[in-house]
């Protein structure tokens, strides 16, 4: 069989096209265990953390490496925090010590009112299998919905209470990139001011 230059080019372009289509279709959120926390404790005024919040942020350097709760033992391998706003830098400040101690980059370029953009980023950019997300508590219900979870099943009245800083939401994502299970647990950290 004699191959012409045109047939070789056509075959090559079809192969490249199928490779690009497969790459575009990859969902990097597939087979992930996603951990979601609220930022650490806040002062009555200001944009940062209070003393208890700074302590919690420091304790996270050990608590999440590895994360061992409820029979899980996973190594967090990517960090995401809601972007700084004029009122709060707390999500970033909560994960900054963990980022520094582990050498993992802290991605904090997406605002907490834009949950869909974070989900899109997790789907389209490689990030590992165990992302940890620190978010503002008032926006966590929207983030849960963006993942396909029900805030009403995970949070009292579908809202994260103002006074709670020590919960972790664990989302398991299946091979098709869809949520397979979701649960809320209480952190086993010993910290003054944490809830029982």
Placement of each model-derived feature along the sequence:
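Bacterial N-terminal signal peptides that target proteins for export
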Residues: 1-9
């Amino acid at each position: 069989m004699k191959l012409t230059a045109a047939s070789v080019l056509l075959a090559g372009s079809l192969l490249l096209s199928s490779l690009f289509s497969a790459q575009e279709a990859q969902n990097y959120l597939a087979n992930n265990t996603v951990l979601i926390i609220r930022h650490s404790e806040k002062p009555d005024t200001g944009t940062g953390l209070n003393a208890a919040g700074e302590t919690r942020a420091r304790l996270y350097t050990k608590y999440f490496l590895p994360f061992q709760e409820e029979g899980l033992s996973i190594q967090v391998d990517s960090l995401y925090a809601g972007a700084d706003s004029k009122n709060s830098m707390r999500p970033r400040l909560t994960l900054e010590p963990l980022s520094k101690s582990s050498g993992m980059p802290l991605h904090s370029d997406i605002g907490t009112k834009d949950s869909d953009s974070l989900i899109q980023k997790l789907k389209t950019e490689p990030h590992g299998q165990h992302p940890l997300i620190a978010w503002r508590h008032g926006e966590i219900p929207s983030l849960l919905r963006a993942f396909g979870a029900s805030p009403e099943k995970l949070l009292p009245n579908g809202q994260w209470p103002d006074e709670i800083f020590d919960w972790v939401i664990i989302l398991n994502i299946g091979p098709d990139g869809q949520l397979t299970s979701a649960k809320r647990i209480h952190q086993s950290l010993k910290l003054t001011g944490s809830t029982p």
